């Protein structure tokens, strides 16, 4: 073995298998770019992002951990969200939930 060497099996890994998802159209109505990380509670994102927040409650971006989506000013795009797992308890972010979903 060589330090840092990776042994990768053939095939694909499906992220968030079996979890509920929803696709929303999101528009940045602000004058600055907005970037949202993979595990940010999407319901609590920057108010300049316009979308159906009710459908985003308890959801996060359905992307690989540690990645993000950037919304340029005036840009609209469809994003897929996936339900949060675990205890489904939210603290922090913008302080809109602060407890159990």
Curated annotation (Swiss-Prot):
GO terms for molecular function: urease activity. Pfam families: Urease_beta. Its EC number is 3.5.1.5. InterPro entries: Urease_beta-like, Urease_betasu_sf, Urease_subunit. SUPFAM superfamilies: Urease, beta-subunit (SSF51278). GO terms for biological process: urea catabolic process. Belongs to the urease beta subunit family. This is Urease subunit beta. The gene is ureB.
